[in-house]
């Protein structure tokens, strides 16, 4: 196998994720030579604005995809929730490895449970999905925008006027934070995860047969089916960063996929949700999106997209 170059964002989490995946590859192919090339993306350079206002998820992957096309790198290790639902022609997700915990972590300054926070308490999150679902269940709380890496957000919780923050559990775990700092992991009835949350997507060129063969050795087919249902739903709903959208799939012992899709307004007042079972992930994602469109969810999406 030739020497491989992995493209990674420069953040601590991205570099840690990349190294963890490289270790996984070396466990199946010990003689691999792999180097990491750090890439600063537009999303990393914009730290003072809400992502949904400056172009959304694709901000973290466009430059990396360009490096793949230019053959400066061989593969990129993305948090799947940052990857837009349509992959450019010529590139592919070569594998979906094991999924980390897909839920959200609620961290309270005083370790007060979410359901017991006093009226007017301030919760920090940079995600419309989290904000909308929290307001839907706890309309007496206040959502305040927060950006920055995990360390920055944990520091802001202590030094600024936040009573609690909500972060993806996967990032905390990959960075080695212990469960001690987490007040609770929120169940899907409280906070349905983002599409692809906790999963990684390994992107490479579609014609790179040698690499695709290697990647197939660390591919998790069950996780791939789940995230395919989730990402199909995202694509069908035309879900952008302006829209609070969530979706989560699991596989039962009977090998059936159960998928729940959710669309909301940012204020949490309108909610469209549907759960369905099936065996074909693409068909399942489409069926749930059709059900939500029948309920009127697409009107919300059109309205929110037109406002931006």
Swiss-Prot record:
EC code: 2.5.1.61
Higher taxonomy: Bacteria, Bacillati, Bacillota, Bacilli, Bacillales
Cofactor binding: number and manner: Binds 1 dipyrromethane group covalently.
Origin: domain of life: Bacteria
Identification of the protein by name: Porphobilinogen deaminase
Homology family: Belongs to the HMBS family.
Regions annotated as coiled coil: none
Gene Ontology biological process terms in this record: protoporphyrinogen IX biosynthetic process
Note: The porphobilinogen subunits are added to the dipyrromethane group.
Annotated Pfam families: Porphobil_deam (PF01379), Porphobil_deamC (PF03900)
Enzyme class: transferase
GO MF terms held by the record: hydroxymethylbilane synthase activity
Catalysed transformations (reactions): 4 porphobilinogen + H2O = hydroxymethylbilane + 4 NH4(+)
GO CC entries: cytoplasm
Organism: Staphylococcus aureus (strain bovine RF122 / ET3-1)
């Amino acid at each position: 196998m030739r020497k491989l170059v992995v493209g990674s964002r420069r953040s601590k989490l991205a570099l840690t994720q990349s190294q963890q995946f490289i270790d996984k590859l070396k466990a199946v192919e010990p003689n691999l030579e792999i180097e990491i090339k750090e890439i600063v993306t537009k999303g990393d350079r914009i730290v003072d604005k809400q992502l949904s206002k400056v172009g959304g998820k694709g901000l973290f992957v466009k430059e990396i995809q360009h490096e793949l096309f230019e053959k400066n790198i061989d593969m990129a290790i993305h948090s799947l929730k940052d990857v837009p639902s349509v992959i450019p022609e010529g590139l592919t997700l070569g594998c979906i490895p094991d999924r980390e915990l897909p839920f959200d972590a609620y961290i309270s300054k005083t370790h007060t449970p979410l359901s017991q926070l006093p009226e007017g308490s301030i919760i920090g999150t940079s995600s419309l999905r989290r904000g909308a679902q929290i307001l839907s269940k706890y309309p007496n709380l206040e959502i305040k925008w927060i950006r920055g890496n995990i360390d920055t957000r944990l520091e802001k919780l202590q030094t600024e006027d936040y009573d609690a923050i909500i972060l993806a559990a996967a990032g905390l775990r990959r960075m080695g934070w212990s469960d001690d700092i987490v007040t609770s992991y929120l169940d899907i009835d409280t906070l349905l995860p983002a599409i692809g949350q906790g999963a990684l997507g390994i992107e490479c060129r579609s014609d790179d047969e040698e690499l695709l063969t290697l990647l197939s050795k660390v591919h998790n087919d069950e996780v791939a089916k789940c995230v395919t249902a989730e990402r199909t739903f995202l694509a069908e709903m035309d879900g952008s960063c302006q829209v609070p959208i969530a979706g989560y799939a699991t596989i039962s012992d009977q090998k059936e996929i159960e998928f729940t899709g959710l669309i909301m307004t940012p204020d949490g007042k309108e909610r469209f949700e549907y759960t369905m079972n099936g065996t074909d992930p693409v068909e399942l994602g489409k069926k749930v999106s059709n059900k939500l469109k029948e309920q009127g969810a697409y009107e919300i999406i059109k309205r929110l997209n037109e406002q931006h």
